[in-house]
Design a protein with these regions (language model features):
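Long non-globular sequence segments
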Residues: 1-86
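Catalytic cores and adjacent binding grooves of peptidoglycan-active enzymes
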Residues: 10, 15-23, 168-249
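Short, compositionally biased low-complexity segments
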Residues: 39-54, 97-110, 190-191
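Electrostatic, structured charged patches in enzyme active sites and in nucleic-acid/phosphate-binding
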Residues: 39-49, 148, 205-211, 220-223
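Active-site acidic/histidine clusters and adjacent loop/turn architecture
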Residues: 62-149
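Short, solvent-exposed polar/charged micro-motifs at secondary-structure junctions
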Residues: 94-100, 156-162, 238-239
């Protein structure tokens, strides 16, 4: 049998290696899916979100999957240990209302008035508070955040770009309880960190550093985050939301 031309041999070898790799991957996927190979839950893309496990490369995917399924979202929310009550689904106006929402009574931090949040929003809030905010407070102040000052969640209104709610504009994520506005934090010793007063993009002091880390950390767990650098309407708070286009400003 004549040998193939020398210039064809690397191509043939490459095709064989590619085929072998595809077969190996397929066998591995089947083995994992059928349980022949046991994969730790934190590295298993089919395992449900573990809300208390340290975030890894699969956390964003698992969080998005939980947010997208009402049953999975409620199951994950139940594992957080937060105190809340279910809010009946209802329409409160054109483009406004609640679906799969909760009234958050306690979240490991004091919240003042209990915000009404969609399940995806409440789940993202826990992930941010537990895995981003509290570690940042311990890093910069050596103590946890005891309370969060907020400006509310649900409001049946349009998008606000700085001059108030705009007639004819799309509905805000607040209109479906998919947004939460955070104005500042109270530390365990009573000190306050305030977005309007303490925000500095250069993070030149502990308060500014905490706010910068809280803002950046929020971008890992929420779909959209807007802060003082976005526009004047957000100079005094962080706007956190789920749904819509991804943004971190």
């Amino acid at each position: 049998v004549p040998l193939p031309p020398a210039q064809d041999r690397p191509a043939r070898l490459g095709r064989r290696l590619a085929l072998a790799l595809v077969v190996a991957i397929a066998v591995g996927v089947v083995a994992v899916f059928t349980g022949a190979i046991e994969v730790p839950e934190r590295h298993d893309p089919w395992a449900p979100l573990d809300v208390r496990a340290a975030p890894n490369w699969l956390t964003t995917y698992k969080l998005a999957r939980a947010r997208g399924d009402p049953v999975h979202c409620q199951a994950a929310l139940a594992d957080t240990g937060m105190r809340y009550e279910r809010v009946p689904d209802r329409v409160t106006g054109p483009g406004c209302g609640f679906e799969n929402a909760v009234r958050l009574r306690s979240a490991g931090v004091r919240l003042g008035s209990a915000p009404t949040l969609s399940c995806p929003m409440a789940l993202s809030f826990f992930m941010w508070e537990h895995h981003a905010l509290q570690p940042a407070a311990l890093r910069h102040f050596g103590q946890p955040v005891a309370a969060i000052d907020h400006l509310g969640s649900y409001a049946c209104r349009n998008v606000n770009r700085g001059e108030g709610a705009i007639p004819g504009a799309p509905r805000s994520r607040h209109a479906t309880a998919d947004a939460f506005d955070v104005a500042g934090f109270v530390l365990a010793d009573g000190r306050r960190v305030n977005v309007r007063r303490d925000w500095h993009p250069d993070a030149s002091n502990p308060s500014a550093a905490l706010l910068n880390d809280a803002h950046l950390g929020a971008c890992r767990f929420f779909r959209g985050v807007l802060g003082p650098e976005y526009n004047a309407a957000h100079r005094d708070h962080f706007h956190l939301e789920t749904g819509g286009f991804p943004m971190c400003r």
